[in-house]
């Protein structure tokens, strides 16, 4: 009887641990901003978090001193790559002292899913402030997304 109880407890512990793996981490998960019928998805990470194969595919150096911003623009309510919207993406990153640098974005297209990737240096540990401007093709006034991320540079 006692052995069955230990096995049952072990199974419950394993199930709880596996379920915990399914819960998304919110620290650097994609975030969204809505502008009418447009949704902008954005995230920023240090490139050392990329899988080596992904970094190699996109020619990105993996390092805790390099950051990567990923932007996707889609039609609100879109469910697949056909709902992606072509855009012009520009932006800048600043530290809390106000030192600012432009971020150059490049378009990637994989199976119809369009993303805009921009790399930036992480000079020191701290909070970085991002200002991203997104314009649909033919649009003169951009949508602006602002967000912060904390980075640790060794």
Predicted regions and their residues:
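Bacterial N-terminal signal peptides
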Residues: 10-24
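Beta-strand-rich domain onsets/edges
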Residues: 29-68, 151
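Beta-strand-rich structural segments
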Residues: 67-77
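Extended low-complexity, serine/threonine- and proline-enriched intrinsically disordered segments
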Residues: 86-95
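Aromatic sugar-binding surface patches on proteins
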Residues: 110-117
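Short, aromatic- and glycine-rich surface loops/edge beta-strands on solvent-exposed regions
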Residues: 128-135
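Short acidic/polar inter-strand loop motif in beta-rich domains
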Residues: 136-143
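Short beta-strand edge segments in extracellular beta-sheet folds
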Residues: 148-154
């Amino acid at each position: 009887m006692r052995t069955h109880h230990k096995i049952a407890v072990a199974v419950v512990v394993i199930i709880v641990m596996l379920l915990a793996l399914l819960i998304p981490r919110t620290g650097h998960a994609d975030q969204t901003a809505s502008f009418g019928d447009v949704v902008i998805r954005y995230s920023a990470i240090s490139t050392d978090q990329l899988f080596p194969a992904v970094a190699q595919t996109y020619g990105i150096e993996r390092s805790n001193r390099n950051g990567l911003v990923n932007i996707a623009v889609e039609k609100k309510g879109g469910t697949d790559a056909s709902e992606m919207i072509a855009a012009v993406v520009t932006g800048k990153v600043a530290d809390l002292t106000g030192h600012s640098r432009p971020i150059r974005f490049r378009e990637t297209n994989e199976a119809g899913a369009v993303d805009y990737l921009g790399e930036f240096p992480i000079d020191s540990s701290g909070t970085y402030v991002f200002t991203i401007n997104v314009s649909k093709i033919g649009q003169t006034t951009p949508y602006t997304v602002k967000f912060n991320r904390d980075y640790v540079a060794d």
